[in-house]
Design a protein with these regions (language model features):
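Glycine-biased flexible loop/turn sites that connect beta-strands or occur in inter-domain linkers
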Residues: 29, 89-91, 105-109
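Terminal output helix/cap of sensory domains in signal transduction proteins
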Residues: 60-84
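Short loop/turn elements at sensory-signaling interfaces that couple input to output
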Residues: 96-120
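Solvent-exposed interhelical
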Residues: 57
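PAS and PAS-like sensory modules
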Residues: 21-23, 77-87, 96-97
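PAS-family sensory domain signal
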Residues: 9-54
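Short, charged amphipathic alpha-helical "coupling" segments at sensory-output junctions
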Residues: 2-13, 120-121
Length: 121
């Protein structure tokens, strides 16, 4: 099961290389965000931290993303959204795709989220 999830992550990031990436583990709270050059923009282990506030995402966008994530399932793993955020001191519109990771061992939701973000052209 862990090997399947790792392969799913590798395949997702390979298909979406050249963009900023997000990797979040729900059980540990470990979050890593990398920029296009694969440099760490943000890393944390505190599950109580408000990531959206850190990147200046407005409340409406936060609720929209949370609502979309709530609708994901083993069959419907991905969501897409366009949000305004501040990354590396640059506030602009970003499109993001989030892919939820699931395990048969956890019945009540996803075990992680991976994703990418890129500026809206």
């Amino acid at each position: 099961s862990i090997l399947r999830v790792m392969k799913e992550k590798v395949d997702f990031f390979k298909a979406n290389s050249g963009m900023g990436s997000i990797d979040y583990n729900t059980s540990s709270g470990q979050l890593t965000i990398l920029n296009r050059k694969q440099q760490i923009l943000y890393q944390r282990n505190n599950p109580d931290f408000d990531l959206f506030k850190e990147f200046g995402v407005n409340e409406e966008d936060v609720h929209h993303i949370q609502g979309l994530l709530h609708q994901t399932s083993v069959q419907n793993k991905e969501i897409s959204a366009t949000i305004k955020a501040t990354v590396e001191n640059n506030s602009q519109m970003y499109r993001m795709k989030l892919h939820t990771l699931w395990s048969p061992l956890k019945k009540d939701g996803y075990i992680g989220i991976i994703g990418y973000f890129d500026t809206v052209k």
